[in-house]
Amino acid sequence: MIDIDHLCPGCMQNNPTPDSPCPHCGYSKDTQPLKNALPVFSILEGKYLIGRALGKGGFGITYLAMHLPTETIVAIKEYFPSTLACRASDNETVLPGMENQKLYFHTGMRSYAKEGEILQRLSGTSGIVQFREMLFCNNTAYIVMEYVPGLSLKKYMKQQKTPFTESEALTLMWPILMALQ
């Protein structure tokens, strides 16, 4: 049974001293959440417990989460186009920003759902994150997928401070290129 009072939203592991930084990942309860992110420990569809936001792009926010029935750590990508949407007062429901943006918002959500369908078709392919399911709640769409810990390519490249050699780039990209063939 999960003890939410001692669960770290930064890594979804037990933090025996929740008032102190997590001994596993260093997350502090004083960490500022990303703007427009779901509140930590929100629950989706009664089965996914939301942890910290992992990142944000123009069309969505990705969260660390836990599938409650199995206590499996997953990543959940939320459709949240920052230029077209805002949160309702409940801090969970996503709303088109303005009346004239509803069409663009819903068209984008349909495209987002297609992205989920493509990811589902590619499940089982080496080099591609594993799709788990698609959710539609809070007036938006969510893609639930396997959580792969580690650095993003962008962060990795920033740390390296030098470009990949042709051989390194090919080694990294080859499984993805084969999956997309």
Range-by-range predicted roles:
Residues 31-50:
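A short, low-complexity linker immediately N-terminal to eukaryotic Hanks-type protein kinase catalytic domains
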Residues 66-74, 80-84:
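Conserved N-lobe loop of protein kinases adjacent to the ATP-binding glycine-rich P-loop
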Residues 89-122:
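AlphaC helix of the eukaryotic protein kinase fold
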Residues 172-173:
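Activation segment signature within eukaryotic-like protein kinase domains
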Residues 176-181:
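Protein kinase catalytic-loop region centered on the HRD/HxD motif
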